[in-house]
């Protein structure tokens, strides 16, 4: 989502933010499921690209975002806030369309993926961006990482709602 340059002293500086958010649907069973996910996300005009991941069992979805005036943020802090809100909106809009879960990740400007093995990727260079206001703060709801780490006990995180004794009794 971001292009960086290096100053003479080696320090990175943000050069350009493109407004793209990457969603991932992982652990698909076969090529039929991959193609199904691609066909579903093609229905939204905000889908810039959708393609099979290098494993052959995932789909990467690129979604366009812009501010309500059509611009993109340029200041680093504004970009971080914008991208976090854009990621959450993308998950909220795309998840109901799919019978498979979107892999939740921390919104990251440096998120990347390997070269695709997809012979027929979906690509729409004229996709319409989702338009959102420039946020001033991070989203209020818990992040995926916070939800996963709420419990102190690893067994309770593996099977929420069950007591540790029940979990161990089932395991042994």
Residue ranges of each PLM-predicted region?
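C-terminal accessory/binding modules appended to enzymatic or scaffolding proteins
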Residues: 150-172
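Short Gly/Ser/Thr- and Asp/Glu-enriched loop/turn motifs at secondary-structure junctions
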Residues: 52-59, 107-112
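Conserved hydrophobic/aromatic beta-strand scaffold that supports enzyme active sites
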Residues: 20-22, 62, 112-114
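Short, hydrophobic/amphipathic alpha-helical patches that form generic packing surfaces
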Residues: 1-4, 92, 117, 170-171
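Catalytic "initiation/cleavage/transfer" segments centered on a nucleophilic residue
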Residues: 75, 97-150
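Signature for HUH/AEP ssDNA processing cores
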Residues: 1-57, 65-84, 145-148, 163-167
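Conserved short secondary-structure elements within globular domains
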Residues: 86-101
């Amino acid at each position: 989502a971001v292009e960086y340059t290096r100053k003479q002293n080696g320090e990175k500086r943000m050069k350009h933010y493109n407004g793209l958010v990457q969603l991932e649907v992982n652990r698909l069973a076969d090529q039929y499921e991959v193609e199904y996910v691609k066909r579903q996300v093609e229905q939204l005009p905000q889908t810039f690209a959708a393609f099979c991941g290098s494993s052959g069992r995932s789909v990467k979805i690129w979604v366009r975002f812009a501010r309500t005036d059509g611009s993109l943020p340029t200041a680093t802090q504004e970009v971080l806030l914008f991208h976090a809100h854009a990621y959450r909106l993308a998950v909220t809009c795309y998840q109901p369309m799919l019978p498979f879960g979107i892999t939740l990740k921390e919104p990251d400007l440096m998120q990347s993926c390997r070269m695709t093995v997809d012979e027929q990727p979906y690509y729409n260079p004229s996709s319409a961006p989702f338009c959102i206001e420039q946020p001033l703060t991070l989203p209020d709801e818990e992040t995926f990482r916070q939800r996963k780490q709420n419990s102190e006990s690893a067994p309770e995180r593996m099977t929420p709602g069950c007591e540790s004794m029940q979990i161990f009794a089932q395991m042994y």
